[in-house]
Regions:
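A conserved regulatory-domain signal marking ACT and ACT-like small-molecule sensing domains
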Residues: 1-140
Length: 140
């Protein structure tokens, strides 16, 4: 099964854990014309009242400037890998086994299937792990 596998930049911003906290940040990107492929937000239990928002891609001068003005920063500690292709049963297991066999303990993963298409975003801890993940997943 052939997948398109690529590295992605991960941008993050702290948000208030309240209605509209994420919307405030995402609206700034939308106004600048961002076409985001990944958005993920979660509360931060260790910081009550706060959350973190992950988004990407952030590209183009206008979008980058808007992201920075809204408080986003490109993460140096989170490296992304995107996998996309045709959907088949068991892909999550195959992807996670390929990562395990490559010695990668990923820090986060999301996946979705829409119709016959599949896409997964994987977060790893280093550029080295991202390169290893891309190489391993291209072999699937």
């Amino acid at each position: 099964m052939a997948f398109k596998v690529s590295r992605t930049e991960v941008w993050t911003v702290m948000i208030d854990d309240r209605p509209g906290g994420a919307a405030d940040k995402l609206e700034a990107l939308a106004k600048a014309g961002a076409n985001l492929e990944v958005v993920f937000a979660r509360r931060m239990p260790e910081q009550p009242g706060r959350g973190i928002l992950f988004a990407g891609p952030i590209k183009g001068k206008k979008v980058v400037a808007a992201a920075q003005e809204a408080g986003f920063a490109k993460s140096d500690s989170i490296h992304g890998v995107k996998v996309e292709g045709g959907d088949k049963p068991g892909l999550g297991a195959k992807i996670t086994r390929a990562l395990a066999n490559a010695g990668i303990s990923f820090r986060g993963m999301s996946a979705a299937a829409i119709g016959t298409k599949f896409v997964s975003s994987i977060a790893v801890d280093s550029a080295e792990d991202a390169a290893k993940a891309v190489a391993a997943l291209k072999k699937l």
